[in-house]
Amino acid sequence: MQPNPDLVRAIANRYAANLRLCLPLRRTSLQLARAVHGNIITFGFQPRAHILNRLIDVYCKSSELNYARQLFDEISEPDKIARTTMVSGYCASGDITLARGVFEKAPVCMRDTVMYNAMITGFSHNNDGYSAINLFCKMKHEGFKPDNFTFASVLAGLALVADDEKQCVQFHAAALKSGAGYITSVSNALVSVYSKCASSPSLLHSARKVFDEILEKDERSWTTMMTGYVKNGYFDLGEELLEGMDDNMKLVAYNAMISGYVNRGFYQEALEMVRRMVSSGIELDEFTYPSVIRACATAGLLQLGKQVHAYVLRREDFSFHFDNSLVSLYYKCGKFDEARAIFEKMPAKDLVSWNALLSGYVSSGHIGEAKLIFKEMKEKNILSWMIMISGLAENGFGEEGLKLFSCMKREGFEPCDYAFSGAIKSCAVLGAYCNGQQYHAQLLKIGFDSSLSAGNALITMYAKCGVVEEARQVFRTMPCLDSVSWNALIAALGQHGHGAEAVDVYEEMLKKGIRPDRITLLTVLTACSHAGLVDQGRKYFDSMETVYRIPPGADHYARLIDLLCRSGKFSDAESVIESLPFKPTAEIWEALLSGCRVHGNMELGIIAADKLFGLIPEHDGTYMLLSNMHAATGQWEEVARVRKLMRDRGVKKEVACSWIEMETQVHTFLVDDTSHPEAEAVYIYLQDLGKEMRRLGYVPDTSFVLHDVESDGHKEDMLTTHSEKIAVAFGLMKLPPGTTIRIFKNLRTCGDCHNFFRFLSWVVQRDIILRDRKRFHHFRNGECSCGNFW
């Protein structure tokens, strides 16, 4: 019997009416949709496409994608609305692979601009800019006309991967040609593209030009331009823009400025901006307070952070929570119990909370606890792995970082460019040049060669592996540079003794309009110190406050003192210490002690050492430097006194360790090491080298033997077994003639070993690179890049 058409129509209308009541994100809506769906199945009703499409839409917007897909698969020939809805649903949930699968199965004749827009938007929102651009090009090739939404979406993807100004201009021209270029949403996206690729002031100028031409600016227009200024360090222009804004839009702009100041390390400026907000009568909101907490956390302002926390708790009209920011505040201020207590009291601990906890332990150097947290986490995402891998590397656990990176891949996580950056940092810690090259090759193969984070990590890795030319090459070929890129190259050149070139790069950076931050100034001061560029170093130090409004920290003052001591200006160094705006820290006294050791200034050196004994009595380096000074002048009673002081205080000298990498295998040597299978052959080879070097004038400096041994022969034997000498002899035996030898040591190399390496490079006619705790030494033809000051 044929069903009554009127009855069918009535049932269909009732279902449609019920589904129209379903609103996204309401639990009752999902329940109603399920009831309708169940009723359809129970009574065997065959609904038309518009009802099925509405059901799929409700399921997708309620994040019930399994139900949506089940219903979608039951449709013999889904129409373009159903396909587009599924694409949007998968993209919103971050499952780009399934979204792409639905899109690619749609016949070209069924696709339209809306379906392309959904897929392009999905790529952009899920940080796959290249795929967004490629699909945009394919869309045009297949004859589909992009609309305003298409351009806004693809430009969001372009902002992620823009290589250069030419690419930005090409898309800008295409938008103008289509008539979409003056639409506010598209113009906002163009401002974002130019700002995010602002490797030069001209691009930021282009962003401002687009902004000025927007006829109907909305809140996003102002905040996008503001964010562009802030992220590129142009806070003065940001403040000018702020003054021209309507009062009802200033809250978001203030938030952007505050967040930008915090991200760039200008914490006092961020807090001053908060004060201005309050005095202007602008209410702080849920976006302001987390930035304030971050500023307090990074600046160590625990009491202010607690006051903000207490204030928010008293505000009944605040329904938001920022427990994750509070966890960071207490961790960074060393209050681990309070941080853990906040975490434990969280009513719902999501993955973000766990990652915040993990990051807190990692950033505070508590790697043991971080490992336990990581193991405890029932769910992990790629960010969890990134935090742990980078944390291991940054805390000196390079080998564990590489193992965890391999484990991550075995667990089925595809490494992103940030994960690769963590692995590359691990290679930098170990000096694992061959491994680093392999990761570089993988990055190129996968298509991450334009990644900013990976590029910056590669510069540092090659520099720390002693291959500064490859660090230069990575920098030159990076499509986009930020201040971290410039900092990495300046640091690389400074570490390797290319101080003048480091200064040239810094000046080039300034000419390009890139504003230095506190790290930039620290690296250029270090470069000046290593190269003995006293006048330039002092000029750059003075510019910190006078030009860039960056108050120097203890680390900057330490570099200045090191610079002055290098040139023997001890009275100037003392004057700097006396005029410090804070109590001298350990690193400042250590810089003074190091300079005294090199120049033999015993009186001032003893003062510096006494200060260090008071600040860090457990640090073995102070005792060793002071012992070296006394030993150099034959004061063996004083050497014995310092050694006894170490024993009485329970201070143990860190074991010296040197290593060399050969074909991804690392060979490690300790002092007096006989554990290596080829140890006997290495010592015989060392003796032969010593004879040849003595013939050419090398005399072992026995003042670096920190024991009162009567026999010079015995003293010389003790010097022969230093770990870096064993490592370099092994390298000379095993590596082909002409190969550069790269040795890494965990402590500062002694004066005799330094002299030994100078003569050795002349005898064997090879370049030898030694990385010790302080810097790099490039030995060639009997000379060292450090100029015998380290």
From Swiss-Prot:
BP term (GO), one: RNA modification
GO molecular function: RNA binding; zinc ion binding
Record region (Type E(+) motif): 664-694
InterPro entries: DYW_dom (IPR032867), E_motif (IPR046848), Pentatricopeptide_rpt (IPR002885), PPR_At4g14850-like_plant (IPR046960), TPR-like_helical_dom_sf (IPR011990)
Claim: Repeat is one of the keywords in the record: yes
PPR repeats by residue range: 48-82, 84-109, 112-146, 147-182, 183-217, 218-248, 250-284, 285-315, 319-349, 350-384, 385-415, 416-450, 451-481, 482-516, 517-551, 553-583
TM regions (residue ranges): none
Pfam family, one: E_motif
PROSITE patterns on file: PPR (PS51375)
Region (Type DYW motif): 695-790
Type E motif, as annotated region: 588-663
Record key words, sorted: Repeat
Similarity section: Belongs to the PPR family. PCMP-H subfamily.
PANTHER family, per the entry: DYW DOMAIN-CONTAINING PROTEIN, PENTATRICOPEPTIDE REPEAT-CONTAINING PROTEIN
The protein's name: Pentatricopeptide repeat-containing protein At1g25360
Gene label: PCMP-H74
